[in-house]
């Protein structure tokens, strides 16, 4: 994912090997960096659209290279050597940069603008709430009507398992951070002070705060941050194509991973393991759907040892997979749930934690004993964010967004999977409106391209050149387009993906020829 290795066009590429993902980060040097810079100039400043040019200020003309922002998940040389892609306007499934160049936003921002970029009802909901009550908090039994209404709506909407309470955050990272505090609070209340460890999975992404980055199973989030925290353990990534043994079926693979999970629990001591956290489909780690019977077997083990299940629905929630939540698709019955992103279609920062009755009853009793539940944020349940989220959920229902996703997703998935025979593609995978492409040589998970070639970064830059924005993580490409994508826009996406793929195939041939000449 771009968060873990590089933004599109970056010269930082990640190696993927048989042992684990994204373990090596190599700065672009020499011809690769020159190629990337050249591509960026060509992409960013060769606009074919003129709709915004009259609005460009002197600052825009001068450009933003060397800007003042410490940019998230961005290498320092990007800011000094490259012009950033500065987005100024959005219309439906498209965004426009400051020069008026138009891009199909195949990532929906960061997996979040499910209703596209300019849904007037969401703008109106925000404006109405700003005019009525721009802010009030939710501390000390004070609250606002939008936050109370949204809590009820979320509890009614989540049907995979009964939930009793909703706690509001500003992001998915904060939601997963909160989960750890809730679980510790819960076990302390039950007189289990040693039951504090968390198990997450290699290649998972759960956020970038101190705790949520620790939960994440991506080394780039840990390097030089003194992470992960010692109470976090990581078990196998359930990526069948990459990690299955010869002759092993998906069910057998799931059984092996479940056994490994149980062995880890027994090694650490079941009395020390508090919770297991998982995304229904792993998102930023490469779009990895679970193998057959995986969650069934994992849940049986968690129940056996009285370990809570936290479902991270930050990416999968609110229709992305063709069900309202990923838990419904994979028959997951969690004790706690994290949501964000499509909760407001990305229009306002908001996340939430859903808490089962079994956990919330204990928290209720403990807070009475202590005199308060001492956790919260200034903007927990922000009335404007909640008003926008309420309108978002209303639109999902009125427009039957689940039916819409299921109507367009087959064409989206099948159209992209038609490129599976490409000699540089190892695997194309996905479900609903989530897609992942992994580049490898010889179509094998054991034959990655040399990381210094930057194949994923090159493909991302060519997509950008052709007018599509995707996410790059090493040699993995990810897409999660808006739910409002039309069938014609899917055709456009597939055509431009194919053009970028052909460019990248040619680039690989060129690099292989250069390598052959050097070695001869």
Swiss-Prot record:
SUPFAM superfamilies in alphabetical order: PLP-dependent transferases
InterPro entries: Aminotrans_3 (IPR005814), Aminotrans_3_PPA_site (IPR049704), PyrdxlP-dep_Trfase (IPR015424), PyrdxlP-dep_Trfase_major (IPR015421), PyrdxlP-dep_Trfase_small (IPR015422)
Residue(s) carrying N6-(pyridoxal phosphate)lysine: 341
GO cellular component, one term: chloroplast
UniProt keyword annotations, A-Z: Aminotransferase, Chloroplast, Plastid, Pyridoxal phosphate, Transferase, Transit peptide
Compartment(s): Plastid, Chloroplast
Top EC class for this record: transferase
A Pfam family per the record: Aminotran_3
Expression by tissue: Expressed in leaves, roots, stems, flowers and fruits.
GO MF term list: 4-aminobutyrate:pyruvate transaminase activity; adenosylmethionine-8-amino-7-oxononanoate transaminase activity; pyridoxal phosphate binding
Protein purpose: Transaminase that degrades gamma-amino butyric acid (GABA) and uses pyruvate or glyoxylate as amino-group acceptor. Cannot use beta-alanine, ornithine, acetylornithine, serine, glycine, asparagine, glutamine, glutamate, valine, leucine, isoleucine, methionine, phenylalanine, histidine, lysine, arginine, aspartate, threonine, tyrosine, tryptophan, proline, or cysteine as amino donors.
Family from the record: Belongs to the class-III pyridoxal-phosphate-dependent aminotransferase family.
PANTHER family in the record: ADENOSYLMETHIONINE-8-AMINO-7-OXONONANOATE AMINOTRANSFERASE, GAMMA AMINOBUTYRATE TRANSAMINASE 3, CHLOROPLASTIC
Annotated protein name in UniProt: Gamma aminobutyrate transaminase 3, chloroplastic
Source organism: Solanum lycopersicum (Tomato)
UniProt gene name: GABA-TP3
